[in-house]
Design a protein with these regions (language model features):
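Intrinsically disordered, low-complexity N-terminal extensions of AAA+/P-loop NTPases
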Residues: 1-171
């Protein structure tokens, strides 16, 4: 898992550099190859994950395994004296860190590209394996609010496999 956390952190940093047109040694996120140790395939049960699917799964796991990586999203937009809308995210009742939304995933993977954004939206449809295999989903978007404003949440079953290396057994 640590290799994937490092990879996620690198891709997140590059995503921000590219979005804000900062100096960056990469011209696209896909140039950063994910680890090939098979860990993510094992815990998801999916053999051929795409780059974007790997990123979404790791984004959803970050609050549970390495929440400080997401602190970058607390940066303020000095033009409006508020956080960047495009980062999405929310703050929990007891967790002081950044909790990602679908908007966060869209920012990392699509930036301002509306066609890529459509691809991110497809990840959260009920026919995608994120949902059918009970890995993760978007929850809690308020009535009339944008679809991607929903909270990016991993299932208890998936968390059990990731954090405890065992199948979830409800009480």
């Amino acid at each position: 898992m640590n290799e994937f956390i490092g990879w996620f952190n690198q891709v997140l940093t590059i995503s921000i550099q590219l979005y804000f047109q900062q100096e960056c040694e990469y011209s696209s996120l896909e140039e950063v190859k994910p680890p090939v140790n098979g860990w993510l395939e094992k815990v998801t049960g999916v053999p051929d994950l795409t780059f974007d699917e790997r990123m979404v799964v790791m984004l959803a796991l970050m609050p549970h395994v390495c929440p400080q990586i997401l602190d970058i999203f607390f940066v303020q937009n000095k033009n409006f004296d508020r956080q960047y809308t495009e980062f999405g995210g929310w703050k929990g009742l007891s967790h002081g860190g950044f909790l990602p939304t679908g908007e966060t995933a869209s920012f990392i993977l699509a930036g301002e590209d509306t066609e890529k954004r459509k691809g991110v939206i497809r990840f959260f449809q009920k026919d995608h394996w994120f949902y059918t295999k009970n890995i993760l989903r978007l929850e809690g978007a308020g009535e009339g609010e944008p679809f991607l404003s929903g909270q990016l949440r991993v299932s208890e079953e998936f968390l059990s496999r990731v954090l405890l290396d065992k199948e979830y057994k409800p009480d």
